[in-house]
Amino acid sequence: AVCVSLLGAANIPPHPLNLINFMEMIRYTIPCEKTWGEYADYGCYCGAGGSGRPIDALDRCCYVHDNCYGDAEKKHKCNPKTQSYSYKLTKRTIICYGAAGTCARIVCDCDRTAALCFGDSEYIERHKNIDTARFCQ
Protein backbone atom coordinates (compact mmCIF):
# COMPACT_ATOMS: atom_id res chain seq x y z
CA ALA A 1 0.00 0.00 0.00
CA VAL A 2 1.23 3.44 -0.83
CA CYS A 3 0.89 6.09 1.84
CA VAL A 4 1.06 9.71 0.81
CA SER A 5 1.46 12.32 3.52
CA LEU A 6 -0.75 15.26 2.69
CA LEU A 7 1.44 17.35 4.98
CA GLY A 8 4.48 16.63 2.83
CA ALA A 9 2.59 17.02 -0.42
CA ALA A 10 1.16 20.37 0.64
CA ASN A 11 4.58 21.57 1.81
CA ILE A 12 2.96 23.39 4.72
CA PRO A 13 4.80 26.60 5.67
CA PRO A 14 6.49 26.97 9.06
CA HIS A 15 4.17 27.58 12.02
CA PRO A 16 4.46 27.77 15.82
CA LEU A 17 2.20 25.40 17.81
CA ASN A 18 3.84 23.94 21.02
CA LEU A 19 3.34 20.21 21.82
CA ILE A 20 1.10 19.80 18.79
CA ASN A 21 4.26 20.35 16.73
CA PHE A 22 5.81 17.18 18.11
CA MET A 23 2.68 15.14 17.38
CA GLU A 24 2.65 16.44 13.81
CA MET A 25 6.33 15.58 13.34
CA ILE A 26 5.69 12.06 14.64
CA ARG A 27 2.73 11.56 12.27
CA TYR A 28 4.96 12.67 9.40
CA THR A 29 7.69 10.11 10.10
CA ILE A 30 5.91 6.96 11.34
CA PRO A 31 4.29 4.24 9.24
CA CYS A 32 0.83 5.07 7.88
CA GLU A 33 -0.92 2.33 9.83
CA LYS A 34 0.25 3.78 13.16
CA THR A 35 -1.09 6.79 15.04
CA TRP A 36 1.05 9.08 17.16
CA GLY A 37 -0.98 7.94 20.19
CA GLU A 38 0.42 4.42 19.87
CA TYR A 39 3.78 5.88 20.85
CA ALA A 40 2.42 7.53 24.03
CA ASP A 41 2.60 4.41 26.24
CA TYR A 42 5.41 2.36 24.80
CA GLY A 43 8.38 0.83 26.58
CA CYS A 44 9.91 2.45 29.63
CA TYR A 45 10.24 6.02 28.31
CA CYS A 46 7.60 6.77 25.66
CA GLY A 47 4.91 8.64 27.57
CA ALA A 48 4.91 10.32 30.96
CA GLY A 49 8.00 9.74 33.08
CA GLY A 50 10.48 6.96 32.55
CA SER A 51 12.85 4.72 34.46
CA GLY A 52 15.26 1.85 34.01
CA ARG A 53 16.90 0.98 30.72
CA PRO A 54 15.18 1.52 27.36
CA ILE A 55 13.88 -1.85 26.14
CA ASP A 56 14.54 -1.33 22.42
CA ALA A 57 15.59 1.20 19.78
CA LEU A 58 12.22 2.97 19.74
CA ASP A 59 12.19 3.30 23.53
CA ARG A 60 15.73 4.68 23.29
CA CYS A 61 14.37 7.44 21.01
CA CYS A 62 12.05 8.47 23.85
CA TYR A 63 14.85 8.20 26.42
CA VAL A 64 17.05 10.52 24.34
CA HIS A 65 14.09 12.89 23.85
CA ASP A 66 13.40 13.00 27.61
CA ASN A 67 17.06 13.82 28.25
CA CYS A 68 17.05 16.46 25.52
CA TYR A 69 14.05 18.15 27.16
CA GLY A 70 15.80 17.86 30.54
CA ASP A 71 18.90 19.57 29.17
CA ALA A 72 16.75 22.29 27.59
CA GLU A 73 15.18 22.96 30.99
CA LYS A 74 18.33 22.78 33.12
CA LYS A 75 21.02 24.23 30.85
CA HIS A 76 18.98 26.73 28.85
CA LYS A 77 16.02 27.52 31.18
CA CYS A 78 13.53 26.55 28.44
CA ASN A 79 10.06 25.08 28.93
CA PRO A 80 9.92 22.43 26.19
CA LYS A 81 6.26 21.51 26.70
CA THR A 82 5.03 25.02 25.97
CA GLN A 83 7.82 26.40 23.77
CA SER A 84 6.63 27.53 20.35
CA TYR A 85 8.88 26.98 17.36
CA SER A 86 8.78 27.05 13.59
CA TYR A 87 9.57 24.13 11.32
CA LYS A 88 8.76 22.65 7.94
CA LEU A 89 7.94 19.10 6.89
CA THR A 90 9.37 18.53 3.45
CA LYS A 91 10.88 15.77 1.30
CA ARG A 92 10.69 13.17 4.09
CA THR A 93 12.64 15.32 6.52
CA ILE A 94 12.01 18.05 9.08
CA ILE A 95 13.66 21.46 9.03
CA CYS A 96 13.80 23.53 12.24
CA TYR A 97 13.96 27.31 11.95
CA GLY A 98 15.32 29.89 14.36
CA ALA A 99 18.71 30.92 15.63
CA ALA A 100 20.91 28.20 17.09
CA GLY A 101 20.95 28.26 20.89
CA THR A 102 17.49 29.78 21.29
CA CYS A 103 14.86 27.84 23.24
CA ALA A 104 12.72 27.57 20.13
CA ARG A 105 15.52 25.96 18.12
CA ILE A 106 16.70 23.72 20.96
CA VAL A 107 13.21 22.30 21.56
CA CYS A 108 12.52 21.93 17.84
CA ASP A 109 15.77 20.00 17.43
CA CYS A 110 14.79 17.70 20.34
CA ASP A 111 11.42 16.97 18.72
CA ARG A 112 12.87 16.63 15.22
CA THR A 113 15.53 14.16 16.34
CA ALA A 114 12.97 12.05 18.21
CA ALA A 115 10.43 12.04 15.37
CA LEU A 116 13.05 10.97 12.82
CA CYS A 117 14.26 8.30 15.25
CA PHE A 118 10.68 6.99 15.59
CA GLY A 119 10.48 6.71 11.82
CA ASP A 120 13.71 4.70 11.71
CA SER A 121 12.86 2.34 14.60
CA GLU A 122 10.82 -0.85 14.65
CA TYR A 123 7.54 -0.73 16.58
CA ILE A 124 7.22 -3.95 18.59
CA GLU A 125 3.59 -4.49 19.63
CA ARG A 126 4.44 -6.39 22.82
CA HIS A 127 6.34 -3.33 24.11
CA LYS A 128 3.15 -1.23 24.19
CA ASN A 129 1.51 -0.84 27.62
CA ILE A 130 4.16 -2.94 29.34
CA ASP A 131 4.26 -3.45 33.10
CA THR A 132 6.78 -0.70 33.87
CA ALA A 133 7.10 -1.79 37.52
CA ARG A 134 8.34 -5.16 36.29
CA PHE A 135 10.35 -4.29 33.17
CA CYS A 136 11.67 -0.77 33.82
CA GLN A 137 13.81 -1.04 36.96
UniProtKB/Swiss-Prot annotation:
Localization of this protein: Secreted
Reported tissue expression: Expressed by the venom gland.
Residues reported to bind Ca(2+): 45, 47, 49, 66
SMART domains: PA2c
GO biological process entries: arachidonate secretion; lipid catabolic process; phospholipid metabolic process
Active-site residue list: 65, 111
Disulfide cross-links: 44-136, 46-62, 61-117, 68-110, 78-103, 96-108
Cofactor note: Binds 1 Ca(2+) ion.
GO CC annotation, single: extracellular region
Predominant location category: secreted
Endpoints of the signal sequence: 1-9
Lineage: superkingdom: Eukaryota
Cofactor(s) needed by this chain: Ca(2+)
Transmembrane segments: none
Family of this protein: Belongs to the phospholipase A2 family. Group I subfamily. D49 sub-subfamily.
PANTHER family recorded: PHOSPHOLIPASE A2, PHOSPHOLIPASE A2 FAMILY MEMBER
Subunit structure: Heterodimer; disulfide-linked. The A chain has phospholipase A2 activity and the B chain shows homology with the basic protease inhibitors.
Functional description taken from the UniProt entry: Snake venom phospholipase A2 (PLA2) that shows presynaptic neurotoxicity. The A chain has phospholipase activity. PLA2 catalyzes the calcium-dependent hydrolysis of the 2-acyl groups in 3-sn-phosphoglycerides.
Name of the featured protein: Basic phospholipase A2 beta-bungarotoxin A1 chain
Species assigned in the record: Bungarus candidus (Malayan krait)
